[in-house]
Protein backbone atom coordinates (compact mmCIF):
# COMPACT_ATOMS: atom_id res chain seq x y z
CA UNK A 1 0.00 0.00 0.00
CA UNK A 2 1.36 3.41 -0.94
CA UNK A 3 0.37 6.29 1.28
CA UNK A 4 1.61 9.79 0.52
CA UNK A 5 1.44 13.50 1.30
CA UNK A 6 0.10 16.31 -0.84
CA UNK A 7 2.15 19.41 -0.02
CA UNK A 8 2.29 22.88 -1.51
CA UNK A 9 4.82 25.53 -2.32
CA UNK A 10 2.62 28.01 -0.44
CA UNK A 11 -0.85 28.43 0.98
CA UNK A 12 -3.81 28.48 -1.42
CA UNK A 13 -2.00 26.69 -4.23
CA UNK A 14 -4.76 24.08 -4.54
CA UNK A 15 -3.70 21.30 -2.16
CA UNK A 16 -7.25 20.47 -1.09
CA UNK A 17 -8.48 20.42 -4.67
CA UNK A 18 -5.62 18.15 -5.73
CA UNK A 19 -6.06 15.88 -2.72
CA UNK A 20 -9.75 15.49 -3.55
CA UNK A 21 -9.02 14.95 -7.24
CA UNK A 22 -6.43 12.24 -6.54
CA UNK A 23 -8.78 10.61 -4.04
CA UNK A 24 -11.64 10.42 -6.56
CA UNK A 25 -9.52 9.13 -9.41
CA UNK A 26 -7.87 6.45 -7.29
CA UNK A 27 -11.28 5.44 -5.95
CA UNK A 28 -12.46 5.03 -9.55
CA UNK A 29 -9.71 2.42 -9.93
CA UNK A 30 -11.19 0.41 -7.07
CA UNK A 31 -8.68 1.57 -4.47
CA UNK A 32 -9.96 2.27 -0.95
CA UNK A 33 -8.74 5.80 -0.27
CA UNK A 34 -9.14 8.23 2.59
CA UNK A 35 -7.75 11.76 2.80
CA UNK A 36 -6.39 13.02 6.10
CA UNK A 37 -5.78 16.64 7.10
CA UNK A 38 -3.58 16.68 10.22
CA UNK A 39 -4.27 20.36 10.91
CA UNK A 40 -6.84 22.65 9.32
CA UNK A 41 -7.60 26.27 10.13
CA UNK A 42 -10.31 28.73 9.15
CA UNK A 43 -13.84 27.84 10.15
CA UNK A 44 -16.45 28.83 7.56
CA UNK A 45 -20.00 29.88 8.41
CA UNK A 46 -22.53 29.84 5.60
CA UNK A 47 -25.42 31.36 7.54
CA UNK A 48 -26.76 28.00 8.61
CA UNK A 49 -23.83 25.97 9.85
CA UNK A 50 -20.12 26.16 10.57
CA UNK A 51 -17.72 23.86 8.77
CA UNK A 52 -14.15 23.51 7.53
CA UNK A 53 -13.62 23.71 3.78
CA UNK A 54 -10.99 20.98 3.45
CA UNK A 55 -12.78 18.11 5.15
CA UNK A 56 -16.11 19.25 3.68
CA UNK A 57 -14.58 18.90 0.20
CA UNK A 58 -13.40 15.39 0.98
CA UNK A 59 -16.83 14.24 2.09
CA UNK A 60 -18.73 15.99 -0.69
CA UNK A 61 -16.74 14.51 -3.56
CA UNK A 62 -15.65 11.12 -2.24
CA UNK A 63 -17.00 8.11 -4.11
CA UNK A 64 -16.64 6.02 -0.96
CA UNK A 65 -18.01 6.45 2.54
CA UNK A 66 -15.41 8.24 4.66
CA UNK A 67 -14.95 8.12 8.42
CA UNK A 68 -15.65 11.72 9.42
CA UNK A 69 -14.05 11.30 12.83
CA UNK A 70 -10.71 10.40 11.25
CA UNK A 71 -10.45 12.93 8.44
CA UNK A 72 -8.67 15.47 10.61
CA UNK A 73 -6.44 15.79 13.65
CA UNK A 74 -6.87 19.42 14.75
CA UNK A 75 -9.28 22.13 13.59
CA UNK A 76 -8.87 25.77 14.61
CA UNK A 77 -11.31 28.59 13.89
CA UNK A 78 -8.81 31.31 12.94
CA UNK A 79 -7.58 31.24 9.34
CA UNK A 80 -3.92 31.46 10.28
CA UNK A 81 -0.72 29.46 10.58
CA UNK A 82 -1.41 26.35 12.71
CA UNK A 83 0.87 27.42 15.56
CA UNK A 84 -0.89 30.78 15.91
CA UNK A 85 -4.41 29.43 15.41
CA UNK A 86 -3.75 26.82 18.11
CA UNK A 87 -2.31 29.46 20.44
CA UNK A 88 -5.46 31.58 20.11
CA UNK A 89 -7.50 28.64 21.41
CA UNK A 90 -5.05 27.77 24.19
CA UNK A 91 -4.05 24.51 22.55
CA UNK A 92 -0.85 22.79 21.53
CA UNK A 93 -0.48 20.48 18.57
CA UNK A 94 0.76 17.02 19.54
CA UNK A 95 2.64 15.86 16.45
CA UNK A 96 3.17 12.38 17.87
CA UNK A 97 -0.59 12.00 18.13
CA UNK A 98 -0.92 13.05 14.48
CA UNK A 99 1.65 10.46 13.42
CA UNK A 100 -0.11 7.79 15.45
CA UNK A 101 -3.43 8.64 13.80
CA UNK A 102 -1.81 8.41 10.36
CA UNK A 103 -0.39 4.97 11.18
CA UNK A 104 -3.77 3.71 12.35
CA UNK A 105 -5.41 4.92 9.14
CA UNK A 106 -2.72 3.18 7.08
CA UNK A 107 -3.75 -0.12 8.67
CA UNK A 108 -7.35 0.34 7.49
CA UNK A 109 -7.15 1.97 4.06
CA UNK A 110 -5.31 1.04 0.86
CA UNK A 111 -4.19 4.64 0.44
CA UNK A 112 -4.06 7.50 2.92
CA UNK A 113 -3.49 10.92 1.34
CA UNK A 114 -2.18 13.31 3.98
CA UNK A 115 -2.73 16.94 3.06
CA UNK A 116 -0.28 19.49 4.40
CA UNK A 117 -1.10 22.94 5.74
CA UNK A 118 0.49 25.91 3.98
CA UNK A 119 4.07 25.32 2.88
CA UNK A 120 6.73 22.96 4.21
CA UNK A 121 8.13 25.26 6.88
CA UNK A 122 4.82 26.21 8.48
CA UNK A 123 5.43 26.04 12.25
CA UNK A 124 3.27 23.73 14.34
CA UNK A 125 4.29 25.13 17.71
CA UNK A 126 4.83 28.59 19.15
CA UNK A 127 8.49 27.85 19.92
CA UNK A 128 9.31 27.19 16.28
CA UNK A 129 10.78 23.79 17.12
CA UNK A 130 8.52 21.72 14.86
CA UNK A 131 7.41 22.40 11.31
CA UNK A 132 5.22 20.49 8.90
CA UNK A 133 8.40 19.29 7.22
CA UNK A 134 9.55 17.64 10.45
CA UNK A 135 6.31 15.65 10.60
CA UNK A 136 6.70 14.61 6.96
CA UNK A 137 10.24 13.39 7.63
CA UNK A 138 9.10 11.39 10.65
CA UNK A 139 6.17 9.88 8.76
CA UNK A 140 8.59 8.41 6.18
CA UNK A 141 6.01 8.93 3.44
CA UNK A 142 6.67 10.28 -0.08
CA UNK A 143 5.07 13.48 -1.35
CA UNK A 144 3.27 15.02 -4.29
CA UNK A 145 4.05 18.73 -4.65
CA UNK A 146 1.38 21.20 -5.77
CA UNK A 147 2.56 24.47 -7.27
CA UNK A 148 1.33 27.41 -9.32
CA UNK A 149 2.08 28.26 -12.93
CA UNK A 150 2.27 32.03 -12.41
CA UNK A 151 5.25 34.36 -12.05
CA UNK A 152 7.39 33.39 -9.06
CA UNK A 153 6.63 29.70 -9.21
CA UNK A 154 10.08 28.68 -10.43
CA UNK A 155 11.79 29.96 -7.29
CA UNK A 156 9.08 28.69 -4.91
CA UNK A 157 8.99 25.25 -6.51
CA UNK A 158 12.74 24.74 -6.69
CA UNK A 159 13.15 25.81 -3.05
CA UNK A 160 10.45 23.34 -2.02
CA UNK A 161 12.00 20.50 -4.02
CA UNK A 162 15.45 21.24 -2.64
CA UNK A 163 14.11 21.17 0.93
CA UNK A 164 12.54 17.78 0.28
CA UNK A 165 15.40 16.15 -1.58
CA UNK A 166 18.08 17.27 0.88
CA UNK A 167 16.06 15.50 3.59
CA UNK A 168 15.82 12.42 1.37
CA UNK A 169 12.04 12.61 1.05
CA UNK A 170 10.85 10.89 -2.10
CA UNK A 171 8.98 13.18 -4.47
CA UNK A 172 6.42 11.22 -6.48
CA UNK A 173 5.68 14.10 -8.81
CA UNK A 174 4.41 17.61 -9.40
CA UNK A 175 0.99 19.15 -9.95
CA UNK A 176 0.92 22.46 -11.82
CA UNK A 177 -2.33 24.15 -10.84
CA UNK A 178 -3.38 27.27 -12.75
CA UNK A 179 -3.59 28.96 -16.12
CA UNK A 180 -1.31 27.65 -18.85
CA UNK A 181 -2.26 29.85 -21.77
CA UNK A 182 0.69 32.24 -21.85
CA UNK A 183 4.21 31.53 -23.06
CA UNK A 184 5.53 32.53 -19.64
CA UNK A 185 3.34 30.01 -17.82
CA UNK A 186 4.33 27.25 -20.21
CA UNK A 187 7.99 28.19 -19.85
CA UNK A 188 7.68 28.14 -16.05
CA UNK A 189 6.53 24.53 -16.21
CA UNK A 190 9.25 23.45 -18.61
CA UNK A 191 11.98 25.25 -16.67
CA UNK A 192 11.05 23.50 -13.42
CA UNK A 193 11.00 20.13 -15.21
CA UNK A 194 14.48 20.81 -16.58
CA UNK A 195 15.78 21.01 -13.02
CA UNK A 196 13.75 18.05 -11.75
CA UNK A 197 12.65 15.37 -14.20
CA UNK A 198 9.55 14.16 -12.39
CA UNK A 199 6.14 12.76 -13.31
CA UNK A 200 3.62 15.59 -13.38
CA UNK A 201 0.16 16.71 -14.30
CA UNK A 202 -1.35 20.08 -15.13
CA UNK A 203 -4.74 21.28 -13.92
CA UNK A 204 -6.32 24.38 -15.46
CA UNK A 205 -8.44 26.69 -13.34
CA UNK A 206 -11.87 25.08 -13.30
CA UNK A 207 -14.93 27.30 -13.50
CA UNK A 208 -16.74 25.50 -10.68
CA UNK A 209 -15.59 23.19 -7.90
CA UNK A 210 -18.21 20.72 -9.08
CA UNK A 211 -16.20 20.30 -12.29
CA UNK A 212 -14.05 17.97 -10.22
CA UNK A 213 -16.72 15.32 -10.81
CA UNK A 214 -15.83 15.07 -14.48
CA UNK A 215 -12.16 16.02 -14.50
CA UNK A 216 -10.00 13.01 -15.31
CA UNK A 217 -6.28 12.74 -14.66
CA UNK A 218 -5.79 9.20 -15.91
CA UNK A 219 -3.07 9.10 -18.53
CA UNK A 220 -0.93 11.76 -16.86
CA UNK A 221 2.56 10.63 -15.94
CA UNK A 222 1.94 11.38 -12.26
CA UNK A 223 -1.26 9.36 -12.00
CA UNK A 224 0.31 6.49 -13.92
CA UNK A 225 3.16 6.46 -11.42
CA UNK A 226 0.73 6.35 -8.50
CA UNK A 227 -1.21 3.49 -10.08
CA UNK A 228 1.96 1.52 -10.88
CA UNK A 229 3.10 1.87 -7.29
CA UNK A 230 -0.29 0.73 -6.04
CA UNK A 231 -0.23 -2.32 -8.30
CA UNK A 232 3.34 -3.29 -7.40
CA UNK A 233 2.80 -2.84 -3.66
CA UNK A 234 -0.57 -4.57 -3.49
UniProtKB/Swiss-Prot annotation:
Keyword list, A-Z: ATP-binding, Biotin biosynthesis, Cytoplasm, Ligase, Magnesium, Metal-binding, Nucleotide-binding
Cellular localization per UniProt: Cytoplasm
Family matches, as CDD domains: DTBS
Positions contributing to substrate binding: 41
Pathway: Cofactor biosynthesis; biotin biosynthesis; biotin from 7,8-diaminononanoate: step 1/2
GO biological process, one term: biotin biosynthetic process
Residues that bind ATP: 12-17, 54, 115-118
Subunit structure: Homodimer.
Alphabetical list of PANTHER family matching this protein: ATP-DEPENDENT DETHIOBIOTIN SYNTHETASE BIOD 2, DETHIOBIOTIN SYNTHETASE
Protein name: ATP-dependent dethiobiotin synthetase BioD
Amino acid sequence: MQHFWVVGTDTDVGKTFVTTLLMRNLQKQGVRVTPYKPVQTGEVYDGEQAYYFDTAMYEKYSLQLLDRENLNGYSFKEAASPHFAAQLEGQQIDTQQLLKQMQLLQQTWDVVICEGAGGLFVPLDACGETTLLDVIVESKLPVVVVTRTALGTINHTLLTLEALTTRKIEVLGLVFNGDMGSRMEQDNIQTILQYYTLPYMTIPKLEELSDINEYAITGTSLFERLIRRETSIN
